[in-house]
């Protein structure tokens, strides 16, 4: 992508392949990709949507502190919840299995907090959004659960599942943004970038 002279370079505060792919879909290629290592532990009684917003902001600010040049920093955090119960970012086979069992046959909500910061001449302009998608999985058999867990694609994923992978076959119902479930709501991303003066359609 050729940058318009009026466009600042994009810095993505994530190494998520899904988020990189989603930006590429709207013809945005980040000039830098920086993983923001932060503590993602929910606060006591913290609700899913505020958690997603807080973590996205923390990621963006962390990356802002690491760069000197003017840029637009995009950060996001995805949280999966059943009611008020926040499911973990699964790190083991057992965590994936527990998450999938909870999601089986139930509606759940996927929240992605989006924080985009325009850093220009040491001035910061912060925009924050939250996107929500309702997803319902069909009732899964033990065989289906065990097979999915054996794929390892739920490792390091919020709620222990990768919607753009095999788990897509489990979706009985979805209401809302599919890109949000993948980790970056494109509608909100484009609108926010535009509000900051970034020419998305150039």
From Swiss-Prot:
Its cofactor is a divalent metal cation. Its EC number is 3.6.1.9. The active site is at 77 (proton acceptor). Keywords: Cytoplasm, Hydrolase, Nucleotide metabolism. It catalyses: a ribonucleoside 5'-triphosphate + H2O = a ribonucleoside 5'-phosphate + diphosphate + H(+); a 2'-deoxyribonucleoside 5'-triphosphate + H2O = a 2'-deoxyribonucleoside 5'-phosphate + diphosphate + H(+). Nucleoside triphosphate pyrophosphatase. May have a dual role in cell division arrest and in preventing the incorporation of modified nucleotides into cellular nucleic acids. This is Nucleoside triphosphate pyrophosphatase.
């Amino acid at each position: 992508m050729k940058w318009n002279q009026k466009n600042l370079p994009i810095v993505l505060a994530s190494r998520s392949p899904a988020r990189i792919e989603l930006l590429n879909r709207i013809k945005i290629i980040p000039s830098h990709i920086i993983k923001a290592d932060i503590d993602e532990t929910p606060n006591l009684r913290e609700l899913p949507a505020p958690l997603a917003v807080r973590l996205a902001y923390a990621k963006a600010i962390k990356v802002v502190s690491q760069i000197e040049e003017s840029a637009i920093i995009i950060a996001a955090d995805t949280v999966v919840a059943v009611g008020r119960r926040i499911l973990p970012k699964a790190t083991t086979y057992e965590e994936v299995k527990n998450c999938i069992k909870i999601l089986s046959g139930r509606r759940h909500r996927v929240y992605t907090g989006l924080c985009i910061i325009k850093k220009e001449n040491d001035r910061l302009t912060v925009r924050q959004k939250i996107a929500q998608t309702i997803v319902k999985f069909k009732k899964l058999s033990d065989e289906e659960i065990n097979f999915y867990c054996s794929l390892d694609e739920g490792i390091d994923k919020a709620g222990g599942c990768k919607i753009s992978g095999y788990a897509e076959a489990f979706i009985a119902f979805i209401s809302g943004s599919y890109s949000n479930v993948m980790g970056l709501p494109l509608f909100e991303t484009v609108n926010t970038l535009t509000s900051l003066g970034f020419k998305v359609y150039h």
